[in-house]
Amino acid sequence: MAKKKIYFGTNTKMYKTIKDTVEFVSQLQELTKDISREDMQLFVIPSYTTLRDANEAKDEDLLMVGAQNMGWEEQGQFTGEISPLMLQEVGTDIVMIGHSERRHVLGETDEEENKKVLCALNHNFTTLLCVGETGEQKDYGISEEVIRIQLKKGLYGVTK
């Protein structure tokens, strides 16, 4: 059985400009260039406006660059969304889906995250499905149940 890679990375949220992101990517690659990538893959998930520049700055042997979210349709009337085709066009490797801010601040559902997961996999992105409970759910002692449901619904229909 082939050994699976461990993925380790960061989401820069809405903190870095294009210049900041390119500098961060360059510094991260320089600092980690001597670390074997055989069993580990590093990734950075910057804001949308920095994706093209981050992808141009990356060394594909050292780093993956990903998107903070992705719509589940290739195109359409989805103001503010970004499609898998757009992400492929700028060289995106990995897509983060279901971040707590998308779920709890923007109200995205497990069913919507599932559509995104299936779409991302269909477009051959490495796909990160984020799961987690709120502080209130943790206080009620239902963390495991919440995460189990998020995983079950978020991965529904995934076959590989």
What do the PLM-derived regions correspond to, one by one?
Residues 1-160:
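Active-site loop-to-helix "anion-binding N-cap" substructures in soluble metabolic enzymes
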